[in-house]
Each structure stands twice: as C-alpha cells, then as structure tokens.
Amino acid sequence: MTDYKATLNLPETAFPMKAGLPQREPETLKFWNDIGLYQKLRAIGGDRPKFVLHDGPPYANGSIHIGHAVNKILKDIIVRSKTLAGYDAPYVPGWDCHGLPIEHKVETTHGKNLPADKTRELCREYAAEQIEGQKADFIRLGVLGEWDNPYKTMNFANEANEIRALAEMVKQDFVFKGLKPVNWCFDCGSALAEAEVEYADKKSPTIDVGFPVADADKLAAAFGLAALDKPAQIVIWTTTPWTIPANQALNVHPEIDYALVDAGDRYLVLAEALVESCLARYQREGKVVATAKGEALELINFRHPFYERLSPVYLADYVALDAGTGIVHSSPAYGEDDFYTCKRYGMSNDDILSPVQSNGVYVDSLPFFGGQFIWKANPNVVAKLEEVGSLLAHETINHSYMHCWRHKTPLIYRATAQWFVGMDKQPRQGASLRERALEAITQTEFVPGWGQARLHGMIAGRPDWCISRQRNWGVPIPFFLHKASGELHPRTVELMEEVAQRVEKEGIEAWFKLDAAELLGEEAAQYEKINDTLDVWFDSGTTHWHVLRGSHRIGHASGPVADLYLEGSDQHRGWFHSSLLTGCAIDNHAPYRQLLTHGFTVDESGRKMSKSLGNTVVPQTVIDTLGADILRLWVASTDYSGEIAVSQQILQRSADAYRRIRNTTRFLLSNLNGFDPATDLLPPQEMLALDRWAVDRALLLQREIEEAYREYRFWNVYSKVHNFCVQELGGFYLDIIKDRQYTTGANSVARRSCQTALFHIAEALVRWIAPILAFTAEEVWKFLPGERAESVMLATWYDGLNELPADVTLNRQYWEQVMAVKAAVNKELENQRAAKAVGGNLQAEVTLYAEDALQAQLAKLGNELRFVLITSTATLAPLSAAPADAVDSEVAGLKLKVVKSTHAKCGRCWHHREDVGQHAAHPDLCGRCIENIEGSGEVRHYA
C-alpha cells in the first residue's frame, strides 16, 4: 500500500502537549518582567476609562497561606479581565506593617526590655523582610501589579499621610478622649479592635450572689408590703467573680416581673419567671410573697457583700431572662452596658472604680485581693462571698468567650482613658458618623448582596471606635494635652501637619524623639506629649487617603474612591468597616463603589484548615507540583461567595480540566499550520456553513463570558469555556472538520474556511482564558499566527467574531437540530461498537428514517451529511419506510439503522466507499481522495 501521508495536511505545532507548568511559568514571569508588561499597560491606559481595585493589605508577617492565594488570584482575575475589557486597571499591592503581632515577634526574638526606639527599628526591619518573602510568592501566582513600588503602611509618606487623615477627623470634631470599657488583652498590655477579638470556649465559674438590702422599707413598699420581717437579698448571677470587688450598681429590666421570695431565713428578690430554676439551683424551698415590675425597684439601695458601700438599682433594657436570676450586677469599669447605664444615672468618671491594672493584677490597695491576678482571684472571691453569707450557688460552665486573636488568651472589658472616633458625636458640619456610614452603605453595591445587611447591622450597633493603643510599633497620635485642663492644644491640626512633614522625612521616630519645645516653644512646660499609637485598623482603614490620594494617586479624578474592595467575609468587621468610617468622616462617602467578599477555605468535608487535622494545602507546594495555573483554575471554578473547598483531589480535578482546555488549544494551533491570516483569512460570506456557525457560537459565548467577568462570576466563565471545549468543539465541531482539514487541498476554500474559523476561535479563546490561566494564555499567544502585540494582556476582547444572520438557511436553530441528530447517531454507534457490530465510526453506514420536515432539513446538507455524522455513508429515508429493526431515538420523528459497511476502506481518508479500487493508478483510494490529490479538489459547501 502506498503511503499517502505526504498528501495530507496533518496537524503540526511546537506548542507542547505536556504543560510542564512548574518549569515554564517562571520563564513567563521573566518575560513579563523583561518587557515591562505592567508599565506598558499603564502607558497605553491613559485614554482608557479607569478601574481601580484597591488592595486590602495583608499583614507583613509569615508565609502566605491558601487563603492569601485565593484573595490575590481573585483580584488578579478581575484586574486582567478589566484590562481586556478596555479599562486602565492599575493594581498597587500593599502591606499592613505596624501593630502588635510584629512587635510581639521582635520581643520574642530580642526580649521585652529593648529601648522603644530599638524595638521600632527592629520591627521595621522584620516587616521589610516578611514583605519580600510574601511578595515573591504573590508574583509566583502570576499576579500582575506594581511590585517594584507597592504601598506599605510603614513607608514614611504613608505614615505622614495617615497623620494628616487623623488631622482631618480632628478638624471635623470626630475625635475625643474618653474613659470607656474597651477590649483589653493583658498579654498585649493594650486595647484591641473589634476585629482583633475571636471567640473560643472557656470554662468559667458561675455564682449566684445575694446583695443585702439597705433600704428595707423602700423594698417592702415596692412589693406592696408594710415592712419586711426578715433579712432580704437581691440575687445576681455572673460568670466573672473577679468583677464583684468593682460592683457599683444592680440592673433590672423595667418591664420584667420580679418576685419577693420567702426562702426561710431570708427574702430573695428574683425574676418571677426564674424563681423555680433559681431555688432548685440553691437547693432551697421558697414561696413567692409578692411581685412587682422592675421599675418599682429603681434606686433602692443594697449593700455590697463585703465592702462598706451601696449598690443602687438602675433600670436597663438589656437585662434578659435567658439565664441567671433576671438581675445583673454592674461593674461600670468592666462592661460596656454597665458603663453606659451608670453614666446615664449620673456617675462621673472619677467615681468609677477600676481596681484591675493593665497586666490583669488588682491594685495592691484593694482589700482582700490586692496584688492577685484576676483569673487566680476568682476562687478567693467565691470564698469571701461564702464567708459573708452571700454565696447562694457556685457552678462551672463552658461557654463562648472573647479571646485575643494573637495570644489566644481571654480578654476583659476594661475602662481606660483612650482616644475615640465618635459614632454619634455631632461634627462641625453635617450628620453624625453613624448616619453618614449607614447612608453610604445604601450607595454601595455588595457582591454577594447579603453583605449589605451584615455591614449595616455592624455599623448600626457598634460603639465609638477606640483608635488609641499603648504600643511602640505604630503611627503616633501626635497630640499635646494641657496638663491642667486636659484639653488638646488649640493649634492641634496645625501642629499635626508640622509633625507629618517631619514624619515624611524621618518616619514615625520623628515624633517619638521630638522635644515638645521644638514645636511649642515656651508653652511646652504646660503640655503633655502623648505617646499613644493608632489602631492598625486606622492604618489600613485610611489607605484610600494615603495611597489612592497620596503615595500612588491612582484614584479617579473625582477623588480617592476605588471601584472595588475585595476581601474575605471577615472584613465586614475589619478593613471594609474601618475604611467606611474613615471615608465617611473625611469625605462624607464610602471609599469604594463595590464590596466583594469571598468565603474561607475548607477541606472537601467542609472542615476548617488546620495543621492538627493535617488538611492544610500549601500554595507553594501546589505551584511546585501542579503549577500556579492549576491553582488559579481551581479558584476561578469555585463559587467563592461561600466556603471554598480545597484538597489534593479537588486540585487534581482542576488539573484534569486544565488538560482538556490545553489540548483543545493545542488542536487549534496544530491545525493552523501553514495559515497566515494576512493572506489566507476568508470573509464570512466565503466560509462554509458549519464554520460560520462555529464562529457565531464563539461570538455568543464571548458575550456571555464578558458578562460573567463583569459580574465577577468566574465559575461561570470556567464552566462555559470548559463546556465549549468539551461539547461544541470536542464533541461536535472539531471531530467533523478533521476530514476536511486533513484531506482537502492545502489552499482550498474548504480548508482555509476551516482554518479561518479555528483562527477566530483561537483568538477569542486565548483572551477568555487569559485572566484565569495567565501563564498558559501567554504561552498560547506566542504560537498564534499573524502579527500581534508582545503579550495577550496588551490586547482587548477579540472583535473579529462574526454573527450568523438569522435569515440564512443554515442558521443557529438549524445547527442545533443537526447537533441533536448527531448525538442520537453517536449513541447508536456506541451501542453498535459495544456489540462489536462495527469497529470505528467510519466502518458504519447509517440510514436516518425521518418525518418529512426533519428529512427536508437534513437533506439541505446533501452528500455532506455523512461528514457531519462522521460515517462513511448517510442515507435519508421517510419515517414510514423504517424497518422493524430501526432504532428509536430521542429526536422526535427520527429512527436509525446502523450497519457495517461492505465496501473497502480508503487508505487515505479511511472512509469505506464503493469506488475504492476502481482506479488503477491508486487502487487503495476513493474517488474523492484522487480528486484531492490529482484533480482540482473536491468542493464543500456546508461541512
């Protein structure tokens, strides 16, 4: 048999079948760097509309984890897709550099007794070192950005502009000093932000404590009695015995019914609804003597169990009946509700008792417990209560309790003098900060939508923002307080600008080493220089000011507003939250137009990632084994609005999907062998009907893909691209065109039409995948024929796809019908192959028995129907002529019969045709192949 291989147009490409991503991706990174891709995008972006995704800064501490990878990849997909959509989409990565975790690391390494200036120096060095490590990992993920000039909250310019942002808020009268209970960590020795608090189970003692009545006559009258004939106690229940020494009041709900219970040796005051459960807990018998509403008990005095002072009853709406006794003991220094209730009843700051020091130890002067650590003092307080006859019950419970996110140790509320941003404080002009923020939320688009209600609820219910910290490594609050009056210097805003100018040159050290006389002159002796630092959430929360408006100036002309903030869902109480407050305080609007949140990573069983469970996935390991593009494809394929499942098995499935997409692109490239779009591209009207349909299908898909990118539905992009490769291309079009592509004349219309379609599809496909498979798209781009920009990212969505007019005979609906018929034929061919009735599809001859309308439709393809069905023969017949052994199909009005061909196989096209062997010069070829080799070539019209 003659070898006819040389007469075929076989696929050929240097594009590798094996991806080798771990080895090839670094070469692409070098290419992007060598051509200055990010800088070129900025250069061509001047006339484009701007899209600003402002980076929420990760903390400059430790290696990146899988959550970091998810976040940065999502951001990069958006930036790349916006670039392809014709936007100028700068991406300035940033880092959060100040704060306790870094200071804690330095103290752990170098000891706690370092001079403050040395601590700051080492913190700055440590943060810089951590940033370099994280930066390398983010770049390796393929994230395109201004890596040579990222923003860092510790950059001198950023530190200075943060002070200026604070000055703006001072100018508008949002900032004040106050004594309030704040989240306090003994290990940190500082207040904590709400976002630095996490909850964990804690075992705590619970005690029921009786406070003896001091105003017995008033108590009797409240219950409608003439007098009390025995001692009486009002009973509280608490899980914090250590707060009893600081008790200053008792709270009841005005509308709850309270009972005076005769418990034998004394009367007990309890919520009526809880009498039965309380008596059972006390192992006592008792009888309700009288009842009264809580409001009747207001201002009745009781005595502290072991100190010579009174505890009056105050009314409070937060008292509930879900546990305890229905009466709450109030220590205003150690509880927010307690504090506000006592203040409402006229208690001054000087009257508030605060015996617990910053390290958790009682002051030495506290009777009975001085010098004791509060957690260790709990049993001693219980013993004292038992000694004085006030302990009615003592148990232990496990409950959810607030802990420090860094030290994992329990926190307390502790009233300290701190600097606050007032939520309801009336500014010099306009609405309160709470009102501004709640209004701004209504102007913000949330993705997913439930984020709006979540953030609204947090803002509506949050207390004033405590912005001061008692640490070394942080941006200073550069205030001077008058020693006599405690008031801020009258030139505070002006002085803050002078400090900012110094910080811009020397960093935060400029404030800490500053002699007050340098700024205040002779006034210095009258003022105290404050050394508090700003909450790190103020650092990151003002990046819209000191980055978009300041160091990088990438905001819109209208001001430092980002189009999008994108972070994990925990940032509703973190960066989204603090940015909203600072934006509304300074500019009276949110610093973002859209908020997008993603969930957290879990394993395939829905469990959180944990080293102890052994279910963590390290991004660096995935990159080194599978490649960054596999990680990117996994991120894109997941609905990130909920929990994001990841495991080795899930990543392997992503790798399998990647292979299908890569193989499809390789098929396209290999069949563009010998194609030059400058000379070989056909106009739509000269293309075959099937090829026009394929280009039209790509156009429809591109519209859907562009919309999915606009709406951040990357999982839809993935599924549409993957399905297109598997179904419309792999399962239909590409199989059909192989015969025409390989066997017709190299420069025939039939082949050039096919190549034109493949070229258009490849041009579109490489762009569709570019935001997700960043490395692979760049690799594909280099192998596409024709002149083009250096990088796919310097292009925009492909505009060469042509729509198939609705009025053509073989329109979209026609090919949908043909696809259904082909699927039915394929199913029967599979059955026949399984039964070993036929070998390959080309060994089969199929007869389609169709009702008249369907037969007429299929007849439009003429002799080319067999090429669509990929059988050696395809015959049409009336449905009424179907023999008994014809097979029903899922297509209405269609039956099938497949038989094995009795004809010889063509040695070139492999079709079984009756004219094989009829040509003496080529005894093993069919007439069609002889025409393609020696004649003017076959003519195709449809497929």
From Swiss-Prot:
Any one biological process term the GO annotation gives: isoleucyl-tRNA aminoacylation
The family this protein is said to belong to: Belongs to the class-I aminoacyl-tRNA synthetase family. IleS type 1 subfamily.
N-terminal signal peptide: none
Co-factor binding details: Binds 1 zinc ion per subunit.
Function: Catalyzes the attachment of isoleucine to tRNA(Ile). As IleRS can inadvertently accommodate and process structurally similar amino acids such as valine, to avoid such errors it has two additional distinct tRNA(Ile)-dependent editing activities. One activity is designated as 'pretransfer' editing and involves the hydrolysis of activated Val-AMP. The other activity is designated 'posttransfer' editing and involves deacylation of mischarged Val-tRNA(Ile).
GO cellular component terms, semicolon-separated: cytosol
Record-given protein name: Isoleucine--tRNA ligase
Superkingdom, natural source: Bacteria
Major localization class: cytoplasm
Keyword Signal in record: no
Cofactor: Zn(2+)
Source species of the chain: Pseudomonas aeruginosa (strain ATCC 15692 / DSM 22644 / CIP 104116 / JCM 14847 / LMG 12228 / 1C / PRS 101 / PAO1)
Annotated domain remarks: IleRS has two distinct active sites: one for aminoacylation and one for editing. The misactivated valine is translocated from the active site to the editing site, which sterically excludes the correctly activated isoleucine. The single editing site contains two valyl binding pockets, one specific for each substrate (Val-AMP or Val-tRNA(Ile)).
